[in-house]
């Protein structure tokens, strides 16, 4: 195995840790981003586990830049025993945290917000470098973390239980929220910072410690975030395991999911893995919060403002190269405006190249709007999906599809519009790539039926100017998703509302709204301040 000497934070980031690994020099592009966060630029091994101490002696994970294929970092992950140790440390830390008054936890959260705020641009660039989303989206993702810290700080003084009237004289009923203990956070590659942020902020403010297993392909984002949080915890006399980190792959994830010392597992990822995770957590009667795949539709009705719809669809279908859980994958067009709207879309899609308005290229270049897919495996899934649609009789409507050469290697593909056959399986599955499937409808009822006729239930949007259609869309006969928008695209939610989806998207809610209520154990407490012992419902039990 690899010889690892740990890297204390105070050491210069470029220090050579292991002669076997410290032989490479990075591109100036990657070095600039990593140095801004004090991450090594010489290929030395980076400890990928933190439970108060940095360490890790599991397998080495390579972080690969999706835009260039360059190895930008090597991370020594946690092994199974170390994961168990970290879980125990997190459990111990939860006892200290739950004793801390909520508003004091709020003050710690405010300081975390400041630490993140000071590095928003640098961290955003790391998201772009490691995940591949464009610069403004990388920064936007960190901003979401900052925003949820603000929200959580406020929540620290307002998380309210309830006082309820009792039917018995001189009795009162309270509903009381208390911390759960340990929240395990398993996150997906496509939001390597924000998803953790939503969970950390709400879990911590409600008095829980956390243990985070990030995606195996975005360990550097996780390490950088944890390094920003670490000094804040230390300054406030809190153990590091209040926000533990275990980089690793499936085995590490399974340790967390299966551990009865992890009171709640907040899992963000695919439906396939989420189903497994949900069953394992259920089997031990733990709590699971599942945020799984989406298959999101936009409906453009005959009375829609087409220019607005166009902007929204392009951002949600092409943005993040189709790699948001909320990306638009299905587009239902009223027959009367369909041809016009498709030609408006194609004007943009067919102009997309490294030279034109919908510019594809280095996500770190401010002018780029289309970045790469995250891995070469994702390119293959994109290609297979397109081949399958065409084999089954569907058509590609865009001039170009397939791999795109922007002159820097990487996993770039052409955003593609397709017209699959009506019964094509692509309508009901999430392909995590910029493929937009189009079909027509004649009535709003039919469009709503099409929107709802898939297993997933994350996000849906209706473009209309008709108030009756709006009412229908939002009501009991309307869209069945967790996010139901009008004249706003399917992606780009704000943190104020609860975020999550229904059906096979997992029914979880994170972030704002009432999401915090899932991170606590609720007790209903009836208190008798009389000198009698009456029973509820007038029951008489003559003693
Ligand atoms: P994924 O399911 O492949 O992996 C998610 C996480 O699970 C990773 O950390 C992975 O290492 C871990 N994992 C894999 N097998 C495991 C197991 N058996 N036990 C425990 N952990 C295991 O997902 P991904 O490819 O990283 O992310 C893309 C998916 O995430 C898409 O389906 C997307 O829609 C979804 N997503 C959903 C939301 C949401 O809020 N609904 C947000 C972001 C992403």
Predicted regions and their residues:
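Structural signal for hydrophobic packing residues in well-ordered secondary-structure cores
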Residues: 94, 98, 113-120, 124, ...
